[in-house]
Regions:
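Extracellular/lumenal and peripheral-membrane lipid-interaction modules
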Residues: 1-191
């Protein structure tokens, strides 16, 4: 069985997407058990192919999403760890980060926000990076720069790579001054 889904201006857990087109293949569930009142379960992995377009305004509108905020905080922790900070997750617990503005340029994403420390003092934080696909599962953030007060959070990294995992296969990634577009595949495995 196969399912095709297409949407314009979709919102998923607070994330706004300009356009989404996905196809799910090999969908096998425990329908017989579901009809008997049991929980729905996947019987085999589902292979999802799709294209997602995210315009600058979509990302701007998604900045308050808890899903995006959590992902950005996790990314910042990875970046701090790569820059030899110890206990980056614990360090970030001392700050409340609110992302307020996003900017797309050719091959560059920039985020501007505010950083509130435990004394309730507020300062600015900036994160900017280029996005390059190294292979189907590795995304390079290069060059990457974080500027913040306190100054110990200021750093730059070159060629920082994010392994997206074996379940992800990105075939195309493009970024210009108006949108980010991604084509790829995802495998959803049963529990």
């Amino acid at each position: 069985p196969e399912v095709f889904l297409a949407a314009q201006r979709a919102i998923y857990q607070g994330l706004s997407l300009s356009a989404v087109q996905i196809t799910g293949e090999n969908i096998r569930i425990n329908l017989g058990q579901v009809l008997k009142g049991k929980a729905l379960r996947l019987l085999e992995p589902i292979f999802i192919c799709g294209q997602i377009t995210l315009e600058k305004n979509d990302l701007q509108g998604s900045l308050r999403s808890s899903l995006l905020a959590s992902g950005l905080k996790d990314l910042l922790a990875l970046l701090l760890e790569a820059n030899k900070f110890t206990n980056p997750h614990q360090m970030l617990e001392n700050y409340d980060i609110t992302w307020e503005e996003v900017e797309f340029t050719q091959d560059q994403v920039s985020l501007k926000g505010s950083l509130k420390d435990e004394r309730e003092e507020i300062s600015a934080i900036y994160l900017s990076t280029g996005l390059n696909l190294i292979d189907k599962q590795i995304l390079a953030l290069n060059p990457l720069k974080v500027e913040a007060k306190p100054e110990h959070l200021n750093f730059s990294l070159t060629d920082f790579q994010v392994d997206l995992g074996e379940e992800v296969e990105i075939n195309h990634l493009s970024l210009d001054s108006t949108q980010l577009c991604c084509h790829g595949k995802l495998t959803v495995k049963p529990d």
